[in-house]
Amino acid sequence: MEIISDKAAMAARSEAVRREGKTIAFVPTMGYLHEGHLSLLKRGRSLCDYLVLSIFVNPTQFGPNEDLDAYPRDEERDRKVAQEAGVDVIFMPNNEMMYGPNYQTYVALEKLPYHLCGLSRPVHFRGVATVVTKLFNIVRPHTAIFGEKDFQQLAVIRQMVKDLDFGIEIIGGPTVREPDGLAMSSRNAYLTPEQRKDAVALYNSLNQAQEMVSAGGKSAAAILEKASETILAVPGAEIDYAKLCDPATLDDVEAIAGPTLMALAVKIGSTRLIDNKVLEP
């Protein structure tokens, strides 16, 4: 396994791999890898000849007063996880490499970012779309794998790849969960032991919503009211959003008429957690 920090060297390596007729799978991350990331890497390993992992805590997707400086980092552990997954190259650029002096070009979508997380994090998806565009141009993968836990991010990237003719296959990897159902996330490291127990309320509310839909429930208001009750029973929990929406457009729905995305963003203490589930009637 090789570690590359220079973007020209990464581009040259990808070009050499392509000249050999090999296919490249790419998993972009911000590091602090967990079993969810490992599942994406294993998927990439199974799909292509060559596997690239990027680790870059992207400053442009964090707004003021968000957790950029506090975001957890553990390079040694990340390297072990990457080795276990069969990664060929870890691309680890720094801020100066990705955003040089007088940097002024950004990628922004018109509609998808202005739902769900974008309502409270207005610059987030501009930063995501920009850094992913740059990484795609450097790594030049045939396939890229993203987690379905970040459903809106996956939707934004799929739309961007389609609109801008990247010619890259985008694959979503299922959410990987702890034994009690909590979605794996690097930010889970912020939780105290008590908050960690309480955080399973997100998963429980999603399951309750599916039970209501399976029993014939169609009212979005009723489903969301029940979810809010479950979450707000947790001391100190604060709901950023709880939404039922069209999985394709992310527009809110008032009634369940087919597969419907339920998406949650909740603060447990100071830690913001997200989760989602596509509810099936």
From Swiss-Prot:
Compartments where located: Cytoplasm
The keyword Nucleotide-binding is annotated on this UniProt entry: yes
Protein's job: Catalyzes the condensation of pantoate with beta-alanine in an ATP-dependent reaction via a pantoyl-adenylate intermediate.
Annotated catalysed reactions: (R)-pantoate + beta-alanine + ATP = (R)-pantothenate + AMP + diphosphate + H(+)
UniProt binding sites for beta-alanine: 61
Protein name: Pantothenate synthetase
Active site: 37 (proton donor)
One Gene Ontology cellular component: cytosol
Residues holding ATP: 30-37, 147-150, 176, 184-187
Alphabetized CDD domains for the sequence: PanC
Domain of life from the UniProt record: Bacteria
EC number, as in UniProt: 6.3.2.1
GO MF annotations in UniProt: ATP binding; pantoate-beta-alanine ligase activity
Keyword Nucleotide-binding: yes
Family: Belongs to the pantothenate synthetase family.
Pathway per the UniProt entry: Cofactor biosynthesis; (R)-pantothenate biosynthesis; (R)-pantothenate from (R)-pantoate and beta-alanine: step 1/1
Binding site for (R)-pantoate: 61, 153
Keywords from the UniProt entry: ATP-binding, Cytoplasm, Ligase, Nucleotide-binding, Pantothenate biosynthesis
Gene Ontology process terms (BP): pantothenate biosynthetic process
Further facts: The reaction proceeds by a bi uni uni bi ping pong mechanism.
Quaternary structure note: Homodimer.
Uppermost EC category: ligase
